[in-house]
Amino acid sequence: MGLNIGLRLWLPQDRFSGVPWLLPGIELLLLVALLAADPGRVASRASRTRAHRVVILLVVLLVVGALLVTALLIDNLITGAKVTQAPGPLLAAGALVWLGNNLAFGMLYWLMDSGGPMMRARQPRQIDFAFTQQLSPELAPPGWRPVFLDYLHLGFTNATAFSPTDVMPLTHRAKYAMLVQSTVALALVGLVVARAVNAFT
């Protein structure tokens, strides 16, 4: 989460419209609140529920922020803003936005699947994503459960292949989320690469 916030701050803020510190500042405050109310250190069920709500709010803000930054970059590409004139800054901004999107959606998948990590630890009945190790238990160690790295890998492969690879979405919400991510990634990569090639020539 901290890495995603940092990526936003590395973007060329003077070339993007809006208040550059607003969304990262809100996300940072929520991250501090989450660390202060770590559900692994509190015994009260009500406190764990509050911490879980903070996590949900933080991840939703990260995803919304990723989509807003993508929309701003696409708008700059269409209107021919200064950031899109030189291929170097354009490719750097595009790479940072693409990476931030993948991190945000990886966290969304991690939080979405089976109701989140705490519910997954209780052997959930309904899963949102089917991993290879779940479909073929003989390929996995006993008691295998997906961890954040598995969802981060899902986010990167979905943004790169624009389709499911080794993890299948099973529920409507999982399919909608992957559809949004792959569509945004396709638009971002297509426009950035096309503009960069045009700037080189």
Show which residues each predicted segment covers.
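Pore-domain transmembrane helices of cation channels
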Residues: 77-118
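Hydrophobic alpha-helical transmembrane segments
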Residues: 1-8, 28-46, 116-139
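Structural signature of hydrophobic alpha-helical transmembrane segments
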Residues: 17-31
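Membrane-helix interface/capping segments
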Residues: 35-54, 70-84, 114-115
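Hydrophobic alpha-helical transmembrane segments of multi-pass integral membrane proteins
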Residues: 1-5, 27-34, 56-73, 96, ...
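Membrane-proximal soluble regions of multi-pass membrane proteins
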Residues: 111-167
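Short, hydrophobic transmembrane alpha-helix segments
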Residues: 7-20
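Pore domain of cation channels
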Residues: 145-201
